[in-house]
Every structure is written in structure tokens, then in C-alpha cells.
């Protein structure tokens, strides 16, 4: 008779493996910020749910939203550019796929990219972000291509679907649109199932939640409790940004953005350790402003900065976008 229980030795092995992943990933380890770089590639344009805080338009000349790509890539283009950048910047160690839609709503492109990278650059760490709707269907492939970090956006664990229906108007499920509370309940069930499958396999899971005042602010402590039960390593609460010019449903209909005070209150309600106000400084570099036209001049400039600030405790990230006009975000951490 087989036993489904996990032995203490195997549990210890999983914990050691998870700690190794945390310590070497710039998104999770403060120490890794100083030594590693990450790159996100936009190979996944389609999405299978509609969020009231989201607008997937990109490459607009008047774009003002943070983190929006200028164009999308085919898997072959993405891999070529990743290998090129990795050859120039030796600190590159993490590759992520997060959109501009949902990574698992574009499984062919997402896993083709991961497969090619796994074959050509097996030392790179790979991660993806997803809304979780299709997560249970692709856990095997996630593990197959050594994708060991997954971020899931989960904004409610209300089993009635009431809260979720105010965030997600519809989902695309089994080739048809499902609306309202039914959609929210399906999404939640799939998210929880997928997260459990990942953590059972020792795959590191981070969860993002968007704080939407008057919608899910009272729900987030329940989200935090459930995520802890499922073995999620990190829960990140982000403020809703709902300016009218962003073109989202919330922005166009007067939903208030979340304030810093509301975010801190939500973090405290979720039992998070709130650090004192950071004295660290961030440096945002735009190549067009610096007029650094060649990759060699950019590389020399960045290496000079890293050397100059290596011993400074108040320096924690060098970030730049628009690098050689590549449709990606590259962050040196």
C-alpha cells in the first residue's frame, strides 16, 4: 500500500531547496540584489480574464502607466535577445514571462520560450506570472522546464464570488465567457488548486494582491491566511492605481486609488512585518537621456555604477528601461 505522506527528511530537503532559490533570486533576497540581474520578455499578449483594474493596450505614444511594454516578441526573438543581453551583462540570471497578457493564456509561446532557453541556457532561472485560471493544467510543464518561481495574482478568497465579481467581470473558460459570481468562483477554485500543486512540488510561489478600497480591503486578511496555509512564500499587497488616463474600468468609473496609509493598514491587518521607512535610494536610468548609444558604453556605465556603489548600504537597485529599444524590462539588482 502506497503512502501519500511526506517523510521528515524529504520535507527538510524541500525546505533547503526553497531557501536556495530564495537566496539566489533578486526578487526575494536583498543580498541577491547586489549580484544578479533579471529580464522580462513580452511574449504572451492574450489574456483569459478581464480585470477591472487592467488595460492591456501597449505601445501608445502617450503611455504613462508603469511597467507597460512597447511591443511584443515571438519566442525566437525573445530568446535571441536574452542570449545577446546575457552575453553582454554577466549578472543576468533570471528570465520572466508576465504578459502583456497572461503567461498561461499563451501556453504555446510561453513554453516554447522556456524550452528554447532551457536547451540553450540551462543555468538561467525562469519564472512566470499568472492569474491562475489555467495553472493546474500546466504545473507539469512548469516543472518540466525548470520554472521554479511562479507569481499568482489573487485578490479574494470569498467562496460566494461576491467580492470577485466586483473585480472580474468575466473569465474565458472552456471556450466561452463566464460572468459574475460564477466566474469568480471558478477562478478562485483554480487558483487555490494550482498553488497547492506548485507548493507540493517545491516550486516557489509568490502571491500578489491588488488593494481595491471598498472592494477587497476587508477580504485581504482572509487571502493572507489562506495563502499561508497553502505554503506561499511571499504575499505582496499592491495599491490600486486608477487614474482616468489609464483607461481601466475602475479609472473611468471613479474608483479611488489606494493610499499609502491604506496599504500599510492592509499589511498590518494581514500580519505582515512592516519595515520602517526605507532610507535606501533607487536610481532610474534612461539611456536616451544619458545619450548612451552603444551597448559597450551602456555596459561600461553600469559596471562603473555598480563598482561605485558596491559598498554603499543606501544603494539597492539600478533599473533602466528602453535598453536598445528592446521590448523588455531589464533590471540590475
Question: Where are each of the predicted segments found?
Answer:
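Canonical Radical SAM [4Fe-4S] cluster-binding loop centered on the CxxxCxxC motif
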Residues: 7, 16-18, 27-74
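Auxiliary Fe-S-binding modules of radical SAM enzymes
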Residues: 1-31, 35, 217, 221-310, ...
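Conserved N-terminal glycine/acidic-rich loop preference
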Residues: 20-22, 27-31, 35, 86-103, ...
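Intrinsically disordered, low-complexity segments enriched in small polar residues
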Residues: 313, 319-322
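Conserved AdoMet/S-adenosylmethionine-binding subsite of the radical SAM
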Residues: 104-238
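Short glycine-enriched, charge-decorated loop/helix-capping segments at active-site entrances
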Residues: 65-70, 166-171, 180-181, 250-256
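Conserved alpha-helical substructure of the radical SAM core
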Residues: 57-97, 107-112
